[in-house]
């Protein structure tokens, strides 16, 4: 079992709301990731788009790229449009040495809409849309396998694959050899799901992990005030492991027992003006080191 610990840049600068962290440079973010002791990162909106340039900056800091988000529109657009964008994304990540590609369906998604409740207004796919999603993901999985990579599907708040039932349906409808799963603690808990149930059920298909924590008060407000996903982020509903309501110890024990081999990425969308990203990166690293002693490769 080889597990590497990385951190997402979304705590430094937000992809969905670029005004959050707009003053933070790419180099500041990766410098602080390195100083905090992480071995890798996912790709953010300020990262160089040229693999050679990006690799140069990361190699200086002994950082690696674990993956990067890809927005699919398989339920609402012709498959060919998604595939063309996916191939470019795949080739970039392949050049960076990543093994998995994070994919999330954005057809009908409300995650980027400030005026839509993440619970009340989330999409519910029709049977035809489910078929299009499953078939399209398997085709993308085939394209990933052409270069020795895998797609990992990201269940996400405000999308058509958020709940346990929706995750179950997607996993049932897709070939395990073509479609793997990203396990995100924060999105599961905020949605009201049991992360241990999901992990134990799909441990053989989980190929990428996000460790995100949730603040109880802000999670309650997300429901009570019918907030959007972005409003919830601004309100501070997410934080790093050890700073919220999630008990990561049993989750870590299940991960160890499963023989998981891959990345664990610390991820917490927060306003860096309110939650200093370097301080929170250190806080998460200290908590994970003290409570889980994650073994890492050299």
UniProtKB/Swiss-Prot annotation:
Mind listing the GO molecular function terms for this protein? manganese ion binding; myo-inosose-2 dehydratase activity
Required cofactors, per record? glutathione; Co(2+); Mn(2+)
What Gene3D superfamilies is this protein classified in?
Answer: Divalent-metal-dependent TIM barrel enzymes
Q: What is its EC number?
A: 4.2.1.44
This protein's source sits in the domain of life called Bacteria
Reactions catalysed, semicolon-separated, are: scyllo-inosose = 3D-3,5/4-trihydroxycyclohexane-1,2-dione + H2O
- EC top class, in one word? lyase
UniProt keyword Lyase present: yes
Alphabetical GO biological process terms: inositol catabolic process
The UniProt similarity line reads:
Belongs to the IolE/MocC family.
Note the PANTHER family from the entry: HYDROXYPYRUVATE ISOMERASE, INOSOSE DEHYDRATASE
> Per its record, how is this protein called by name?
Inosose dehydratase
